[in-house]
Amino acid sequence: MQTKSILTAALLAAAPASAQLHELAVKAGLKYFGTALREGAINSDQQYNRILSDTREFGQLVPENGQKWDATEPNRGQFNFQQGDITANKARQNGQGLRCHTLIWYSQLPGWVSSGNWNRQTLEAVMKTHIDNVMGHYKGQCYAWDVVNEAVDDNGQWRNNVFLRVFGTDYLPLSFNLAKAADPDTKLYYNDYNLEYNQAKTDRAVELVKIVQDAGAPIDGVGFQGHLIVGSTPTRQQLATVLRRFTSLGVEVAYTELDIRHSRLPASQQALVTQGNDFANVVGSCLDVAGCVGVTVWSFTDKYSWIPETFSGEGDALIYDRNFNKKPAWTSISSVLAAAATNPPASSSTSVVVPTTTFVTTTTTPPPISSPIVPSTTTTSAVPTTTVSPPEPEQTRWGQCGGIGWNGPTKCQSPWTCTRLNDWYFQCL
């Protein structure tokens, strides 16, 4: 982060203390800040529903599972949109944008597809029927569709799946052509994880975009899932460099499934600070690249995160805790968005297809930021003893260290000093 990007310091003066993430993101030049929706929680958890439906906080929704193949066509030719409609209906009711996810993916694929005895003609017919029906059902509602998901494995090779075995890489342009025919007006994305590290997997994803383009098929965007680890997230500059590898090909980019998990729990106060800085670097990199259109977190509360089920002993990867309190990560994101709001970057030429009013006029009181638990002083009748408190967490260079509403660290790592920029924002300089 450059000093000058923070020192544009009408900063939060242009964004009052009540400003929320989507509102700030739009002011900063992005199209949206959004969240995934956990279908099973929306009707059973009122607090979850209230925050998710706050259009100043989240301007876009994406279904976590409801539009995947196993949900929409569990048996051949038998379509069920009940789960996918939960998110689509909620977005429409609230006036939020909708990202749609996903069409061609090796996982959550019914056995009748993955184990079928196909040739090119028969599998293409299956793909066409699926894409026509699913995209047809949501036609006109989706800003973008993740057409192909995770086609590259962790070693940077083409992922072995039924589509690759039958078509080779021809299934990639085929998928995008079928999607374009089904809904000509939505944006068509390739979506994957670990592209952020700019290694062999990223190289292969660049090749994928070129394969689709060279075949004359349409591809509009690349989604960076952003499933990252606290302390191992690339820097803001490194992330922006990777984003530009794709925008230079003429496609837009977005962070589509962002979460940053702690590898050890419970997280220390210092780890929470690091997590906040990592989130700020991701969001900041999107602000730094004109072709980056938005950020979506993969659910917003630790209560409904997929991480603990997949990575044992890890988690707390989101911006609200399990009790719906805003974490330091939320504050870090809001700060980096507010810093850019007075001097937003150039935006790309298209807009999210959402109603003109993108956030509500009525406001709700956000849940309080939880206070850190400090061990209490204990004594005995014989010999007084004191439990030593953990060291005060320290903010890194460029990080926020104070201001109205700030509940994070107020001490900077040496040799940096906590410097007042305005009443709302103090920074380690």
Curated annotation (Swiss-Prot):
The active site is at residues 150, 257. SMART domains: fCBD, Glyco_10. It is an enzyme of class 3 (hydrolase). It is found in: Secreted. Its main location: secreted. SUPFAM superfamilies: (Trans)glycosidases (SSF51445), Cellulose-binding domain (SSF57180). It holds the Pfam family CBM_1. Pathway: Glycan degradation; xylan degradation. Keywords: Carbohydrate metabolism, Disulfide bond, Glycosidase, Hydrolase, Polysaccharide degradation, Secreted, Signal, Xylan degradation. Residues 371-389 have a biased composition (Low complexity). Residues 1-19 form the signal peptide. Residues 364-395 are annotated as: Disordered. Gene3D superfamilies: Glycosidases. It catalyses: Endohydrolysis of (1->4)-beta-D-xylosidic linkages in xylans. One of its GO terms (cellular component) is extracellular region. Residues 43-336 form the GH10 domain. It comes from the Eukaryota. Residues 393-429 form the CBM1 domain. Induction: Induced by xylan and Avicel, and repressed by glucose. Its EC number is 3.2.1.8. Endo-1,4-beta-xylanase involved in the hydrolysis of xylan, a major structural heterogeneous polysaccharide found in plant biomass representing the second most abundant polysaccharide in the biosphere, after cellulose. Belongs to the glycosyl hydrolase 10 (cellulase F) family. This is Endo-1,4-beta-xylanase 1. It comes from Humicola insolens (Soft-rot fungus).
